Amino acid sequence: MTDYKETLNLPNTTFPMKANLVQREPEIILWWEENAVYEKMLEASGAKGIFILHDGPPYANGHIHLGTALNKILKDIVIKSRNMQGYRSCYVPGWDCHGLPIELKVEQELGKKKQEMPLSLIRNRCREYAEKFLDIQREEFKRLGVFGSWDHPYQTMDPIYESVITLELARFVEKGSVIRSKKPIYWCYSCETALAEAEVEYADHTSSAIFVRFPIHDKRLHTIFPQADLTTTSIVIWTTTPWTLPSNMAIALNADFDYALLQYKNEYIIIASELVDICLKQFNWEDAKVIKVVQGKDLEGMKARHPLYDQESMIVLGDHVTLEAGTGCVHTAPGHGPEDYEVALRYNLDVYSPLDDQGRYLDTVKFFAGLRVDQANPVVIQKLEEFHRIIQKNTIQHSYPHCWRCKSPVIFRATTQWFISMEKNNLREQSLKAIKKNIEWIPSWGEDRIYNMIASRPDWCISRQRIWGVPIVALICESCGEVWNDPSWMKKIAEFFAIHPRGCDYWYEAKLEDIVPVGLKCPHCEGEQWKRESDILDVWFDSGSSFAAVLEERPNLGFPADLYLEGSDQHRGWFHSSLLISIGTRGVPPYHAVLTHGYVVDGDGRKMSKSMGNVTSPQEIISKFGVEILRLWVSSVDYREDVRISNEILQRLVDAYRRIRNTCRYLLGNINDLTLDELVPVKEMESLDQYILDVVATAYTEIQKSYISYDFHTVFHKLHNLCTTDLSAFYLDILKDRLYTSGVRSHKRKSAQTALFYILHMLLRSMAPILSFTAEEVYKYIPDTLKDDNVISVFMLPFFETSSFLLDDRVRSYWETLLLIRAEVNQAIEPMRKKGEIGHSLDTHITLYVAPELHTLLLELNTDLCSLFIVSQLDIMPLSEASVDAAVSKIDGLAVAVNRAQGNKCQRCWMYKELGSNHQYPTLCPRCTEVVENMKI
């Protein structure tokens, strides 16, 4: 028997079936770099304008983790998709290089040597440390397949950048928004520095909780409570921070609450009326009784006695007093709480905070000198018990602020700090207005989150008592301690930062006479001796100034950005500081839209932690699966919530990837002999080919819309469904006969190849932002006869216009009906297959019994129904002539009869036909005979 395999047009491509991603990806990255593909992509785009995504700088410390990989890949998808849609979209990566984590690492490395080293040398070691990890992270990000200006990133420690930071501060000073005062702020006594709200995280903590008597000897007591005994009456407070009691200055009540005088045996106490029952139960006072009730405002100004010292504690009023816990009488230490501080300002109380930077009581503190606050609680409680001041004590577990870096509990401590006022120049009001009116928040709940944060936040403490950062450019009078920071002078200092090889190191290295203006006298005391301010700026001011240092300075960028894209924790971080600085200095927000993603958790939804042993690194995934699978994972999840990852999840994505890759390989294999001048005009293509182009073009359009709306998981599902359902399971399955057995130059085959060519281009453009390595690899294997010599990369392809592929609604509706008929035919065939009467649908003869309207539809579509249904023989008969064995269909006006095909099976196409019309080819059908004969010519 003759073998006709050589006469078939079988797929032919050298595109490898096995991806070999781990080995192949680095080769592609090297090729991208050698051929400047990122730059060429930018050159090829821009017809529709520009799109600006501004990179939030990761911290230059340690290796990247899955969270940073998720973030960078999301940004890369945005950048590539926008460029391929015709928008020039540059990606300038950045790094946050100053701050405590780096300084602490350097301190660990230096050990005791740090004490003997000059500040400039320590700063230089910090810079080297940041540079080291910047280089490490840069290579790790490039390994993710992320395009960008990797040779020209922005760094917050660049001299120009440090200069801009100082200029932004000068703008605030110019507007009168910067104040220096003694206020209680978050203080980490382990790190010995002030903290911003963004540097504080909450965790469960066990605290001592005590009810404390403050004796009242004020003679006014008898005027309000005639029954009270001045020798045994107290007002009772409840506190979970006993260590702050040495700093007590007052007791706060709510003016509108009722307060009761209670008698228990020979003792009298004052607490809020609504809390009497709860408190008595906690005190185990069964026989106590209410003597009299008055309002809080009636007690204002009365003097109590401090429970530890021979001093007074005034009764004051405050709206912050609630009835949620305690006694309704609030211990007030203005040096250790923002609400206490506000009350102190109204009543002219001393803002007393007798602690050093390490959280130890000063030598002037009686009983507790030298004790650290975390050691002080039991000692304070013991002393209170000695004085019989405690009614009841226990412990509670509650959410308590901790340092983001060292994880230690933090305290409020009043120190002299620099602040940006939230009220001056209406910074708070303008920011809240912009949040509501000028910015799109994705997802929408981000709006309420940042709005509430800014609505309730205190003034921004911008000073830090550390070394590694941008100095606060100000002079301090040696005589009176007042500061001088004229904005014009600050701007001149900033100019020196810009030209100094190590930027703001100029502040520390320059001679004092080169910094202090000649003849400068203190406006307050006329002193002429000055010293430099030693505090540095909050690193959130550094990164928050990036719009000024990057967007307003770099070519191809601009202000404001179209998009900021970071993790949801940045509502209190970079989004927050950037907004305040931009509103404060420009009057407008720095971004049009803010997109946030969640955290990466394990397959069970648990937070990843080393202690749980469930941490997965990007490097592990890349070395096992290749980064393409990691990128596919990013696109497959709804990243706006926390996203799960596990080996099982990744394995499923490997399978999905394989299907997409195999689809591309099949398309490549079947256009290997096609040339551009052989492309068939769409209107002249076979009906089925026109239909599939409509299907793919519609999906392609939806995918592009999903890229624009950042719905990348929709892109993944549409792309995967297109490859598996619309193409592999439907169109490509039908097409095999026409592609393999038709004449090599026949219209039918060229029509099919034309469709495959266009489909491949739509697939490539759909997948390239996500599956960048595979798309590039596929593009390289497209025959040169089908490519523009000047377009060397898939990322240089122009935007693909699909309008000519779209069918009108009537034809599309006809096809939808025809596919329903196809499904009915397949269902009717299945019983014969199960019985073993046939092995393949080609073994069947189908009779369609149709009503007139269906008959008209079938004729109008003018398609080969045998090919569409993958059967050998098909007849169309009037429904009225339906045989008794015809299966009734779910479609009105249709019945289907299935029989074995008549005749013999063609050796070449496997369809049942009358064979041997040409005696030279006794086993071929007439169609195959003609094709084989023509091959001789």
Swiss-Prot record:
CDD domains documented for this protein: Anticodon_Ia_Ile_BEm, IleRS_core
Q: Which residues are involved in binding Zn(2+)?
A: C906, C909, C925, C928
* E.C. code: 6.1.1.5
Q: Where in the cell is it found?
A: Cytoplasm
Substrates-to-products reaction catalysed: tRNA(Ile) + L-isoleucine + ATP = L-isoleucyl-tRNA(Ile) + AMP + diphosphate
InterPro entries to which the protein is assigned, alphabetical:
aa-tRNA-synth_I_CS, aa-tRNA-synth_Ia, Anticodon_Ile_BEm, Ile-tRNA-ligase, Ile-tRNA-ligase_type1, Ile-tRNA_ligase, M/V/L/I-tRNA-synth_anticd-bd, Rossmann-like_a/b/a_fold
Cofactor info, note text: Binds 1 zinc ion per subunit.
Q: Where is this motif: 'KMSKS' region?
A: 607-611
Chief place where the protein resides:
cytoplasm
Cellular component terms (Gene Ontology): cytosol
Task: Report the residue ranges where the short sequence motif 'HIGH' region is annotated in this entry.
Answer: 58-68
Q: Which SUPFAM superfamilies match?
A: Anticodon-binding domain of a subclass of class I aminoacyl-tRNA synthetases, Nucleotidylyl transferase, ValRS/IleRS/LeuRS editing domain
BP-aspect Gene Ontology terms: isoleucyl-tRNA aminoacylation
In terms of domain of life, where is this protein from?
Bacteria
- At the top of the EC hierarchy, this enzyme's class is ligase
Q: Which UniProt keywords are given for this protein, alphabetically ordered?
A: Aminoacyl-tRNA synthetase, ATP-binding, Cytoplasm, Ligase, Metal-binding, Nucleotide-binding, Protein biosynthesis, Zinc
What residues does ATP bind to?
A: K610
Q: Which residues bind L-isoleucyl-5'-AMP?
A: E566
Q: Which GO terms describe its molecular function?
A: aminoacyl-tRNA deacylase activity; ATP binding; isoleucine-tRNA ligase activity; tRNA binding; zinc ion binding
PROSITE patterns assigned to the protein according to its UniProt record, in alphabetical order: AA_TRNA_LIGASE_I
Cofactor(s) it depends on = Zn(2+)
Entry domain remark: IleRS has two distinct active sites: one for aminoacylation and one for editing. The misactivated valine is translocated from the active site to the editing site, which sterically excludes the correctly activated isoleucine. The single editing site contains two valyl binding pockets, one specific for each substrate (Val-AMP or Val-tRNA(Ile)).
Q: What does the protein in this record do?
A: Catalyzes the attachment of isoleucine to tRNA(Ile). As IleRS can inadvertently accommodate and process structurally similar amino acids such as valine, to avoid such errors it has two additional distinct tRNA(Ile)-dependent editing activities. One activity is designated as 'pretransfer' editing and involves the hydrolysis of activated Val-AMP. The other activity is designated 'posttransfer' editing and involves deacylation of mischarged Val-tRNA(Ile).
Q: How does it assemble?
A: Monomer.
Protein's UniProt name: Isoleucine--tRNA ligase
- Species source reads Lawsonia intracellularis (strain PHE/MN1-00)
